[in-house]
């Protein structure tokens, strides 16, 4: 169930302060954040966020299409290495 419209989108207070500071100064450095749950709002367009994925910070450049999504959606937390299999199966699949 989506968030109520009367409440508005959730944005972490500390993150919003960092965004306002960056917009006032015109700074283009990535804004470091652990707040993956924050919703992307129109004020974020054109800014770069360094979103923490649990291990490192992933740079996310915000565009118009991202509005309404969460910052965490663009910084995957899991890596898929592939399933182990024998070489024979891989060769047979290729034929």
Swiss-Prot record:
GO terms for biological process: ribosomal small subunit assembly; translation. GO terms for cellular component: cytoplasm; small ribosomal subunit. The keyword rRNA-binding applies. Keywords: Ribonucleoprotein, Ribosomal protein, RNA-binding, rRNA-binding. GO terms for molecular function: rRNA binding; structural constituent of ribosome. The keyword Ribosomal protein applies. Signal peptide: none annotated. It holds the Pfam family Ribosomal_S19. Belongs to the universal ribosomal protein uS19 family. Protein S19 forms a complex with S13 that binds strongly to the 16S ribosomal RNA. NCBIfam families: rpsS_bact (TIGR01050). HAMAP family: Ribosomal_uS19. This is Small ribosomal subunit protein uS19.
């Amino acid at each position: 169930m989506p968030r109520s419209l009367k409440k508005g989108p959730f944005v972490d207070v500390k993150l919003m302060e960092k965004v306002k500071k960056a917009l006032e100064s015109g700074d283009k450095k990535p804004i470091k954040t652990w707040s993956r749950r924050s919703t992307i709002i129109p004020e974020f367009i054109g800014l770069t966020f360094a979103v923490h994925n649990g291990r490192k910070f992933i740079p996310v450049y915000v565009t118009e299409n991202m509005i309404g999504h969460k910052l965490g959606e663009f910084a995957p937390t899991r890596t898929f290495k592939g399933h182990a299999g024998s070489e024979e199966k891989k060769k047979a699949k290729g034929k």
